[in-house]
């Protein structure tokens, strides 16, 4: 195999998404992996598995294996096995639900236990979801950032509903795992709202203005 063939090979990363039920984990992963947003809440039983390939600076192709872990698995026998081997862990909470933030301590305790047993240290990111509901926020950004600083987490705020910063979150996590620095232009481009309308043929489409231009919501409302 030539050097060029080796260089063109994909890197693969296992990213595990943890947090309470209804924190928006599945909406977050589907918005990223499938560019859709489901209006109806459907509880994840066990886990869901998603794949998406992205390109990082230097034309590095990276396939993200995203493990969306059901919120009810905390304390379950399989949780350790789901986390094992992950290069990245996303701790997701709902910024309007204080308990979902408090319970991340329990999720992180399991991550630390698995890390100690496997002698590997995944990158851990704290993800505040549902920023489209800023007016209902119950967890102040300062508390979020303090939790990050105390534990060495990377910090992210996203909206799975609008797509705001969803791609950027996964992109930054993958880049940080691989030691790649994103420049300002790449970050700004990834912050754009994901274009991923859900088509419902039983309803008349509604027009809406979205900023920035030429982008749209992960859900049609």
From Swiss-Prot:
Post-translational modification comment from the UniProt entry: Isoprenylated.
GO CC annotation, single:
endomembrane system
**InterPro entries (alphabetical):** P-loop_NTPase, Small_GTP-bd, Small_GTPase
Reaction(s) this enzyme catalyzes, per UniProt: GTP + H2O = GDP + phosphate + H(+)
**Annotated stretches, region: Switch I:** 35-49
Residues binding Mg(2+), per UniProt: 26, 44, 68
What are the names of the required cofactors? Mg(2+)
Modification type N-acetylserine: residues: 2
What does the entry's free-text domain comment contain? Switch I, switch II and the interswitch regions are characteristic of Rab GTPases and mediate the interactions with Rab downstream effectors. The switch regions undergo conformational changes upon nucleotide binding which drive interaction with specific sets of effector proteins, with most effectors only binding to GTP-bound Rab.
Give the protein family: Belongs to the small GTPase superfamily. Rab family.
Name of this protein: Ras-related protein Rab-28
Q: Which organism is it from?
A: Homo sapiens
């Amino acid at each position: 195999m030539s050097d060029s063939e080796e260089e063109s090979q994909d890197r693969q990363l296992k990213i595990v998404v943890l947090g309470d039920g209804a924190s928006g984990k599945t909406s977050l992963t589907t918005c990223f992996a499938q560019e859709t947003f489901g209006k109806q809440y459907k509880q994840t039983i066990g886990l869901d598995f998603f794949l998406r390939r992205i390109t990082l600076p230097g034309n590095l192709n990276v396939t993200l294996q995203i493990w969306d872990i059901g919120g009810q698995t905390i304390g379950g026998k399989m949780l350790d096995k789901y986390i094992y081997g992950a290069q990245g862990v996303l701790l997701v909470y709902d910024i309007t639900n204080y308990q979902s933030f408090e319970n991340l301590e329990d999720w992180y305790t399991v991550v630390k236990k698995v890390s100690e047993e496997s002698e590997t240290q995944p990158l851990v990111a704290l993800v505040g979801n549902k920023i489209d509901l800023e007016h209902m926020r119950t967890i102040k950004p300062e508390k979020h950032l303090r939790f990050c600083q105390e534990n060495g987490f990377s910090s992210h705020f996203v909206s799975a509903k609008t797509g705001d910063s969803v791609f950027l979150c996964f992109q930054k996590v993958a880049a940080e795992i691989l030691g790649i620095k994103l420049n300002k232009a790449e970050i700004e481009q990834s912050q754009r709202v994901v274009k991923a309308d859900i088509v419902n043929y039983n309803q008349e489409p509604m027009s809406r203005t979205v900023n920035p231009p030429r982008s749209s919501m992960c859900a049609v409302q």
